[in-house]
Amino acid sequence: MATLKVSDSVPAPSDDAEQLRTAFEGWGTNEDLIISILAHRSAEQRKVIRQAYHETYGEDLLKTLDKELSNDFERAILLWTLEPGERDALLANEATKRWTSSNQVLMEVACTRTSTQLLHARQAYHARYKKSLEEDVAHHTTGDFRKLLVSLVTSYRYEGDEVNMTLAKQEAKLVHEKIKDKHYNDEDVIRILSTRSKAQINATFNRYQDDHGEEILKSLEEGDDDDKFLALLRSTIQCLTRPELYFVDVLRSAINKTGTDEGALTRIVTTRAEIDLKVIGEEYQRRNSIPLEKAITKDTRGDYEKMLVALLGEDDA
């Protein structure tokens, strides 16, 4: 469930564009007005506001926001105002500019989006960067990371609920044998993770637990803690089977470490507010005994804090 609260009475896009223009004029930017508008509009509404702003003022709203705002607040507003496919393309491109730690972002985009959402991200990547996402991922990665990540970002999974229980039994056995032999990079393991539907993967790993007496993630914990590929494999499985638990882990790490990881915090809130941030928040509170909103407000300040709280649906609007 989403946390985004869209206003009951939404003005015309031209009116929103005019109000945003007003927020940029004068001696100082009116950040509260910007939040009151953009943080309470759906992706489609934000898209139309951008179009109206461009038609009326001959400027790209994103460029104006970039010029008027700064720091973490600017990042949150810009990510939020982008269309979801554009946003994922940007996040993925940024990840290909960095090294190992960014592999998780590529995996996250590939595994927590629907097939259609991932396709839109790849199309947006083509349009924005004049090359393919898989091309940049292949260039950015090597070895086992390349095999896994290129397979994941090029995936187009069946989205239905139908599963083949015979296949689940066969592949649970196959995966168990590979894990037992520590062949974590086996092509069949990568094939299963990158081509099977999420329903089929869940059926396979449920059968794995039934047949072998422990969850697959528990089996993978027996590997080398310093093995970065194994860590990415664990995160991949978690994203495909229980994404809310993956996001809780990322949020907890982002908020609880010395010095907040605003990049991860902003990414999760802006990408999940229209999808399942309510479920993530409930799981966060269950596991950490503190509401997500309270954890965030303890570690953030100013307009950045106000924006995140608004996307959590916890402001007064």
UniProtKB/Swiss-Prot annotation:
GO molecular function: ATP binding; calcium ion binding; calcium-dependent phospholipid binding; copper ion binding; peroxidase activity; protein homodimerization activity; zinc ion binding
Location(s), subcellular: Cytoplasm, Cytosol; Membrane
Listed Gene3D superfamilies: Annexin
Effect of deleting the gene: Plants are hypersensitive to osmotic stress and abscisic acid (ABA) during germination and early seedling growth.
Record keywords: Acetylation, Annexin, Calcium, Calcium/phospholipid-binding, Cytoplasm, Membrane, Metal-binding, Phosphoprotein, Repeat, Stress response
GO cellular component, one term: cytosol
Primary site of residence: cytoplasm
pH note: Active at pH 7.0 and 9.0, but not at pH 5.5.
Intervals holding Annexin repeats: 11-82, 83-154, 166-238, 242-313
Induction: Up-regulated by cold, dehydration, salt, osmotic and oxidative stresses. Up-regulated by abscisic acid (ABA) and salicylic acid (SA).
Residues with Phosphotyrosine modification: Y129, Y156, Y284
Entry-linked SUPFAM superfamilies: Annexin
N-acetylalanine modified-residue sites: A2
Organism domain of life: Eukaryota
Function: Has a peroxidase activity. May act in counteracting oxidative stress. May also mediate regulated, targeted secretion of Golgi-derived vesicles during seedling development.
Protein name: Annexin D1
Record family assignment: Belongs to the annexin (TC 1.A.31.1) family.
Ligand binding (Ca(2+) 2): I255, G259, D299
Modification sites for Phosphoserine: S102, S155, S289
Binding-site residues, Ca(2+) 3: T300, E305
Pfam family, one: Annexin
UniProt PTM: Phosphorylated.
Residues recorded with modification Phosphothreonine: T100, T112
BP GO terms, sorted: calcium ion transmembrane transport; phloem sucrose unloading; potassium ion export across plasma membrane; primary root development; response to abscisic acid; response to cold; response to heat; response to osmotic stress
Oligomeric and partner information: Monomer and homodimer.
